[in-house]
Structures are given as structure tokens and as C-alpha cells.
Amino acid sequence: YGKPLSVPQGVIGLMTRFGMDVVLAHPEGYDVMPEVEEIAKKNAAATGGSYKKVSTMEDAFDGADIVYPKSWAPFAAMEQRTKLYQAGDQAGIDALEKQLLAQNAQHKDWTCSEEMMKRTKNGKALYLHCLPADITGLSCPEGEVDNSVFDRYLVPLYKEASYKPYIIAAMILMSKVKDPVSALMALDQGSKRKLF
């Protein structure tokens, strides 16, 4: 099905901001939003990092320190889906999902396998994923990552996942409160019971 673009777009925007050398790989037609790519390019230029786009996983994995393979639907499909939802066109949504499944089936070789991991820096890049992942042989017949690769990285993956609730809570707080630091300090000073 058509998965959202939030992870690849967030990663290229954020990691270039930290000065990392970021390589985005995707099959033809699976573009992300052009505005986000521009942000990644500007961030890389400002921080001394780099951003480039390639059309093969091999090119992205070669010498990588970290890999974050994640499937997503093309931006154009997300735009189409939005219009269909706005129109209340359930038949159109169902047809689009079938079309996306057929399109995805053409790229089943885009998986994080043991062979692909051998291409990374010393064959030991850190594997990350936002979870849940489509795990070949475990959660689906042909997924984003081989079971053996996923199993090897369980601890860092679960650590990564454990931060999500706090990040989400922080984002909510920052969007709702003008001065989040003062608000948290006031909560801490007013509490008789320490929560942390």
C-alpha cells in the first residue's frame, strides 16, 4: 500500500541539518517533495554536510555508516490520494491502492539484505527503522528488511523506538506552549512529588 513520505523526508531534512553526508536512494517515480529536497540541499551547504540522490540501493549503501531503508509511496500518489479523500471517492482510493501495490511489486529487490549490508562501511553500518518494519519471512513474504538483519539490530531499534513518545510529547508541548522551558520549570517547582 501507499506508505507516507514522512520518514524519508524527515531524515533528509534533519540529518543534513546536523552536517551529515546523506544519500537518498529510490526507484524512478518515488520522488519526495521537491521543497524538502531543497531544504536538505540548503542544510547540507550551511553545515558542511552533503546531500545527493541516487537510483540504486547499492549506491546508497556503499561505504555507509548508517542505513535507514524505508518504503514509501511516490509524492504524486500522495497528492492523488488527498484529492480522492477530499472528494469522498472510496472507489478511486481503492483503485489507487491496487495501482500502488502493483507498482511496489516491481521493486521487491529493494530490501535490506545481508548482501546489501556487506556493502556498508566495514560491513557494519547501523541499521535504523521507524518501526514497524516489513520483515521478510516474519511479518510478510517479501519485506523491507531480511529477518537476520533485523534481528541483529533489535537493541538499537528498540532504543530508537523508545524515544518516540517523548519526542511526540515534546512536539505537542512546543506547539501548544509559547515558552516550554518556563512551563516545565514551573511544573517542576510547583510539584511536591518529583517525577524524574
Model-flagged regions — what are they?
Residues 39, 43, 119, 174:
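Residues that form generic nucleotide/phosphate-binding pockets
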Residues 47-51, 78, 91-94, 151-155, ...:
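Glycine-rich loops and low-complexity Gly/Arg-rich segments
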Residues 1, 103-110, 157-161:
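Hydrophobic alpha-helical scaffolding
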Residues 14, 116, 148-149:
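Hydrophobic/aromatic ligand-binding patch that stacks against planar heteroaromatic rings
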Residues 120-196:
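Adenosine-phosphate binding glycine-rich loop
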Residues 77-141:
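ADP-ribose/adenylate-binding Rossmann-like module
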Residues 6, 10, 35, 55, ...:
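Conserved active-site and cofactor/substrate-binding residues in soluble primary-metabolism enzymes
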Residues 1-83, 87:
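Glycine-rich phosphate/diphosphate-binding loop of Rossmann-like nucleotide-binding domains
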